[in-house]
């Protein structure tokens, strides 16, 4: 049974008018919080994410400490991959490293199928614990998108130019679309289970898809994303898409069956609207600005809020994730600024 007392963000995601602009921050849970760093001295990342009590604690901390209007599940986008046969290791200072990278169709055909109930019960238990007992604001579930996940699986880890990924996509389209189908099946099952456990909105992170041009996106990715979001629509929860450096793809996203488009810091709300974006937009303060002086933070935040309130249909967020060097006190002050300033308008 849900114990939500503040559903402002859901109303905003649905395009309804709200009393103020709701706010949350990508990567709000975790590295920037002293409580989390203290926890990491006792437990590994694996232990935190696999113990519902610990994971729920980390997930809800930003709501308690900053006053955000939503929590986002504390997990990594790589979390479901081991259950379809991907040998992934999160290496400190590097990121995800794949020990069995995809090289051909045979590698794709070896991938299995995820069963969230038996494979990731700790994820679902965390969601239920939060939504039934602990959170009075909505919980956002999430998944990585096929292109972004595939880029790690093909490159073998993080990449600057995604040359191996693009080469396989161009050279072996049959292999590419077979991989897209496998990942789409996994994402749909994984997200289905999150919503059924209690998640009230879903964000799909397509972090690196901006490396594709618009034509390649239309051919190799858009049909895949259309299928995923179309199938997830049956849950009647808000669906959000987000990527970095993807200004040239905004109108492609506007065609997708999503409710919300996340903007990174490079494209203003006004620019997105001038391009023709009609969906609810989420964003988009540059995280680096939060390392500046308060006068600059306040000025830039109000500018974003003014544009959001002028055009309507806006949820405040950063243009990328919270970095470890951002002070928790700054995030609390920022949340208060967003709420108070937008209430006065």
Curated annotation (Swiss-Prot):
The record marks 76 as: Transition state stabilizer. InterPro entries: UROD/MetE-like_sf, Uroporphyrinogen_deCO2ase_HemE, Uroporphyrinogen_deCOase. It catalyses: uroporphyrinogen III + 4 H(+) = coproporphyrinogen III + 4 CO2. Pathway: Porphyrin-containing compound metabolism; protoporphyrin-IX biosynthesis; coproporphyrinogen-III from 5-aminolevulinate: step 4/4. GO terms for cellular component: cytosol. Keywords: Cytoplasm, Decarboxylase, Lyase, Porphyrin biosynthesis. Signal peptide: none annotated. One of its GO terms (molecular function) is uroporphyrinogen decarboxylase activity. It is an enzyme of class 4 (lyase). Homodimer. Catalyzes the decarboxylation of four acetate groups of uroporphyrinogen-III to yield coproporphyrinogen-III. This is Uroporphyrinogen decarboxylase. The lineage of its organism: Bacteria, Bacillati, Bacillota, Bacilli, Bacillales.
